[in-house]
């Protein structure tokens, strides 16, 4: 690994992984350059980043951060980092695989919030929806309950005023 280009790539990978708690490893083999470019764009829109590198370098960078990926790093692999919205990035990967008749990119696994996860967990995460949509749903549920509570208090206040009159 004395190659200067490999050293530079490893340093870049280590820097990119610094502070990242959620990332996925995917097989991208079979995507055209245009499809790969489109995938990068959709991942970037969700606050993520796709990095293609040699498995050996990916493995070294992960081990440097105390994360071991072992068997998943076989065949062509790319790292997909989730900077902002882990579910949104997972959904972008899932949507891209559904568009492709070969099911590529194929998710091999990942780390979510620092915990190693398998393909099924990443697929479930992708089905959740984006962070913003989940937050909007939560706000809607809370505001509906608050509105009901205010209505109950108003009815009780009117009842008390009626008794005092």
From Swiss-Prot:
GO-annotated biological processes = translation
- Return the Pfam families for the record: Ribosomal_L10 (PF00466)
- UniProt-recorded Gene Ontology molecular function terms: large ribosomal subunit rRNA binding; structural constituent of ribosome
Keywords in UniProt for this one?
A: Ribonucleoprotein, Ribosomal protein, RNA-binding, rRNA-binding
> Per the record, what is one GO cellular component?
large ribosomal subunit
Which family is this sequence assigned to?
A: Belongs to the universal ribosomal protein uL10 family.
Q: What does this protein do?
A: Forms part of the ribosomal stalk, playing a central role in the interaction of the ribosome with GTP-bound translation factors.
Q: Which PANTHER family match?
A: 39S RIBOSOMAL PROTEIN L10, MITOCHONDRIAL
Return the protein name. Large ribosomal subunit protein uL10
What does the organism's lineage look like at the top? Answer: Bacteria, Thermotogati, Deinococcota, Deinococci, Deinococcales
